[in-house]
């Protein structure tokens, strides 16, 4: 009896990486990576367009939405693409079985990529697969609607992946020129995806002095939001520094930087001529850009095809956490800087000005508030003594005119002196001038407003109001009764000027004849005009103020007739030869 010994089958334990292309943009990225010859990766393409699936180079394809779209595409509607992916969710999960790391690539802004990519990523995440999203944003010339759909799809995909890399197609203009073809430009965008995948696969698959396992990669990229990914190649004396600089500055990524990164994965690949100093120089340059406490994982491998060249690939993660803290600090600094700017504007407005003293009381000592209160009260007293009376005079109807035409100018200060008790005690103005009691009561809150606004308007001192305490009245300021009297005086002015001139011979004769006719008028006719002034006197209570200026003139500015004076004038002014002729 013979015993046959057979070696047991050993299951190969190695990480399995899958690149899942969704939609038209994801399928094109997979085709470019297959053309370049990326090894150690499985490719899967899913699309709602049956015609696009026939042109793919991948061996594993998924027709999304057989019942929803019937192979005609999503029509740039993300809802249709999402429904198509949910219809084939079981087939998607089957292709993800046994995968340790999945790259989900798509072009955002369309229907299938925008709607189906989050579904595929969520399915991979639910199975515990390290999920990395690599998506592109549309060009600006594709319109605002497509850009808005892309932004919404990126926000939805961010919730379902561990790490998300966004490549705006508009950034292709940074590296393209007028001779760059359209296909070559998209190949440059796919190079970002290729470099990221190759960076990880080379460290785990290829021969090297410093090899990494998949657990190291997972510790760097798990739950790290948006990363920064770049690759640089250089040759010559300073090739290590040049390659590191090119890897740090990736012009295609969406305005990201390695500043403050929490996780860093560095892959340095070169020929057999790679030296220790070059590795140290490249790694040190990259380490200067990240956080001092960052988790840095370094790998160095050899590639016979890179004789004379050096390739440096970098994957930096955890950038959004530091950026969020930096934005918060910037917001706090802006808020702190904006506080002193609010106080001057609040001092000008009446409402915030009342709040500002309360804020000052909580910060300043009480002695400062007492001094400020004393200064404000003193300024308010000066305002009331010097300027308040002059401001309140135009609001009254006739009192300024009575002060202006008063007989003695020394009475003006006496009239101003009662202004102080009028503002403080209410009964005083009632006893002196009951007619103007209402305007003076309304004007009482005015000093309070001046006290609230006194700290703001300190420049115009009250001394400037002393040269002109009383304003010259205008015709419009007079009441209707005085306006009528002024009109009559203007009309009677030429007549009065003629009578005041030197009297000629004919004027004296006519005056003497007119005066004799006036003496013969009956007493009833003479009493009628004399009664008119007596009846009109009560209508103008201020008429007595004009009495010193009128003298012997009537309301029309003419001299009042007198019988005795007329007779004396006849006897004195008429020559003797005229009296003989008249006799």
UniProtKB/Swiss-Prot annotation:
InterPro entries: Cell_div_FtsZ (IPR000158), Cell_div_FtsZ_C (IPR017844), Cell_div_FtsZ_CS (IPR020805), FtsZ/CetZ (IPR045061), FtsZ_C (IPR024757), Tub_FtsZ_C (IPR008280), Tubulin/FtsZ-like_C (IPR037103), Tubulin/FtsZ_2-layer-sand-dom (IPR018316). Gene3D superfamilies: Tubulin/FtsZ, C-terminal domain, Tubulin/FtsZ, GTPase domain. It holds the Pfam family FtsZ_C. It is found in: Cytoplasm. Disulfide bonds: none annotated. SUPFAM superfamilies: Tubulin C-terminal domain-like, Tubulin nucleotide-binding domain-like. Homodimer. Polymerizes to form a dynamic ring structure in a strictly GTP-dependent manner. Interacts directly with several other division proteins. NCBIfam families: ftsZ (TIGR00065), FtsZ_alphas_C (TIGR03483). This is Cell division protein FtsZ. The lineage of its organism: Bacteria, Pseudomonadati, Pseudomonadota, Alphaproteobacteria, Hyphomicrobiales.
